[in-house]
């Protein structure tokens, strides 16, 4: 990756400077929040390693690192529902990425839903936490897409 090391930079350089200095965690990952570029809705939260971040910058498609599979993946490589990146941002200390995307096919979640955030935390009559579906319509059948 062509970015400079965050450890070699003064805090002001990281927070106010114009050089990309992503701060990856001990596992070499950085959190990525992905939102719909039009609505602003959060579609998913995933992780990127240095290679995924660079591929995203270079290609304009969203690339992530799967912790469970321990591998790099391009969003949509199995489903065809590619995320086209319209804007990328880093937070103040460059340890989180925010990408605004155009979501191909309308669904970002592997469950077939538009967003991975399709359940709201409410309380039942006893006050216990309860998950309530919101925007939970499936746009595709995962069993047919991920064979």
From Swiss-Prot:
Amino acids binding Zn(2+): 92, 109, 116
Similarity section: Belongs to the PRA-CH family.
UniProt enzyme class: hydrolase
SUPFAM superfamilies to which the protein is assigned, alphabetical: HisI-like
Keywords (A to Z) from UniProt: Amino-acid biosynthesis, Cytoplasm, Histidine biosynthesis, Hydrolase, Magnesium, Metal-binding, Zinc
Signal peptide stretch: none
GO process annotations (BP): L-histidine biosynthetic process
GO cellular component: cytoplasm
Oligomeric form and interacting partners: Homodimer.
Free-text cofactor note: Binds 1 Mg(2+) ion per subunit.
Compartments where found: Cytoplasm
A Pfam family matched in the record: PRA-CH
Binding site for Mg(2+): 91, 93, 95
PANTHER family associated with the record: HISTIDINE BIOSYNTHESIS BIFUNCTIONAL PROTEIN, HISTIDINE BIOSYNTHESIS BIFUNCTIONAL PROTEIN HIS7
Top-rank taxon: Bacteria
Enzyme Commission number(s) from the entry: 3.5.4.19
Gene3D superfamilies reported in the protein's UniProt record: 4.10.80.70, Phosphoribosyl-AMP cyclohydrolase
TM helices/strands, residue ranges: none
This protein's pathway: Amino-acid biosynthesis; L-histidine biosynthesis; L-histidine from 5-phospho-alpha-D-ribose 1-diphosphate: step 3/9
Purpose of the protein: Catalyzes the hydrolysis of the adenine ring of phosphoribosyl-AMP.
Reaction(s) catalysed (UniProt annotation): 1-(5-phospho-beta-D-ribosyl)-5'-AMP + H2O = 1-(5-phospho-beta-D-ribosyl)-5-[(5-phospho-beta-D-ribosylamino)methylideneamino]imidazole-4-carboxamide
Record HAMAP family: HisI (MF_01021)
Name of the protein this chain belongs to: Phosphoribosyl-AMP cyclohydrolase
């Amino acid at each position: 990756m062509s970015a400079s090391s965050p450890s070699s930079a003064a805090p002001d350089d990281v927070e106010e400077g114009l050089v990309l200095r992503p701060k990856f965690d001990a596992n070499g990952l950085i959190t990525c929040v992905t939102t719909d570029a039009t609505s602003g809705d959060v579609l998913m939260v995933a992780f990127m390693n240095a290679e995924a971040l660079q591929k995203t910058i270079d290609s304009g498609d969203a690339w992530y690192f799967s912790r469970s599979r321990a591998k790099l993946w391009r969003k949509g490589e199995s489903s065809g529902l590619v995320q086209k990146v319209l804007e990328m941002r880093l937070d103040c200390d460059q340890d989180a990425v925010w990408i605004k995307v155009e979501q191909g096919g309308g669904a970002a979640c592997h469950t077939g839903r538009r967003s991975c955030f399709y359940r709201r935390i409410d309380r039942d009559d006893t006050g216990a936490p309860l998950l309530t579906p919101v925007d939970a319509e499936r746009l595709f059948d995962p069993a047919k897409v991920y064979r």
